[in-house]
């Protein structure tokens, strides 16, 4: 019996030397797990839930490491969180969070800006433990990621038109209008929600702001639905040109005509 035990221990130690694994099959320092995109399989490694904080503008996301090693996880934009209160709004994240590092058993909480998905429902309260829909790949996610990809150019136009858009909160509010348009929100419904959440129940101010941005929001919403990059470029050119003073606009058009003429001459030579 003693001889048998010694042989077993010797075999186990030999396996550890050859493979780097202890007898129980677990490494002392498991490799870092990097999660670039969230799938159903990710649930075996990290737990992702959210807590409402009384607004549709942001949510607290709780990320917990349930694996045996260290995890690095990226949270993409467009994560869809389901409100446990069916009478209140679900939320979808407006921004991604890069590289959250978690040791075994560690949990981190990050506040993430969000968009509301249903203008007709109540504003979220403070209910905890919202589930994340890992499989959501709908039009809102695609719209957010298209905007994110071309955010620099779109923001440049918005800020040029109105310096108030230098504020990220103002830009998020503008794109929230686009999200509501994608979900068939009506003008009066949107104005009522803006008045309650953003303008201290002042419907007159909410209405004034809404009508100052709605034309651009409708046009941009149509482009985002089609994901047409060329249409976006043309729209931005037209919008930026319209912001130029009249005399500069004429000069710009003349310069463009001259460039086109010179290009034609070069081709004919």
Model-derived features: positions:
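C-terminal motif of bacterial Sec signal peptides marking the signal peptidase cleavage site
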Residues: 18-20
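Bacterial N-terminal signal peptides that target proteins for export
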Residues: 1-9
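Activation targets extended, charge/polar-rich intrinsically disordered C-terminal tails
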Residues: 157-269
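Short, solvent-exposed loop/turn segments enriched in Ser/Thr/Gly
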Residues: 54-61
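Asparagine-centered strand-capping/turn motif at beta-strand->loop junctions
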Residues: 61-75
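Intrinsically disordered, low-complexity Pro/Gly/Ser/Thr-rich segments with frequent PxxP/GP/PP motifs
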Residues: 82-135
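Metal- or metallocofactor-binding catalytic centers and their adjacent structured scaffolds
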Residues: 132-170, 203-204
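Bacterial signal peptide processing site
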Residues: 22-24
């Amino acid at each position: 019996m003693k001889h048998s035990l010694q042989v077993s221990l010797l075999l186990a130690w030999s396996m550890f030397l050859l493979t780097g694994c202890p007898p129980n099959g677990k490494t002392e320092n498991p490799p870092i797990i990097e999660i670039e995109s969230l799938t159903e399989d990710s649930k075996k490694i990290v737990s992702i839930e959210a807590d409402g904080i009384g607004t549709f503008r942001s949510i607290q996301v709780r990320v917990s490491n349930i694996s045996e090693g260290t995890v690095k996880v990226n949270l993409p934009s467009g994560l869809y969180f389901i409100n446990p209160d069916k009478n209140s709004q679900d939320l979808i994240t407006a921004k991604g969070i890069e590289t959250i590092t978690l040791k075994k058993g560690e949990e981190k909480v990050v506040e993430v800006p969000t968009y509301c998905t249903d203008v007709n429902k109540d504003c979220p309260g403070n209910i905890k433990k919202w589930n994340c829909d890992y499989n959501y790949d709908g039009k809102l996610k695609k719209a957010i990621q298209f905007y994110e990809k071309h955010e620099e150019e779109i923001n440049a136009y918005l800020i040029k038109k109105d310096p108030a858009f230098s504020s990220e909160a103002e830009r998020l509010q503008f794109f929230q209008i686009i999200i509501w348009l994608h979900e068939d929100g009506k003008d009066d419904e949107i104005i009522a929600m803006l008045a309650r959440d953003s303008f201290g129940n002042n419907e007159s101010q909410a209405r004034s702001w809404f009508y100052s941005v709605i034309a651009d929001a409708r046009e941009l919403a149509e482009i985002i639905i089609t994901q047409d990059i060329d249409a976006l470029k043309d729209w931005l050119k037209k919008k930026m040109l319209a912001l130029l003073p009249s005399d500069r606009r004429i000069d710009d058009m003349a310069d463009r005509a001259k460039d086109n003429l010179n290009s034609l001459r070069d081709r004919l030579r």
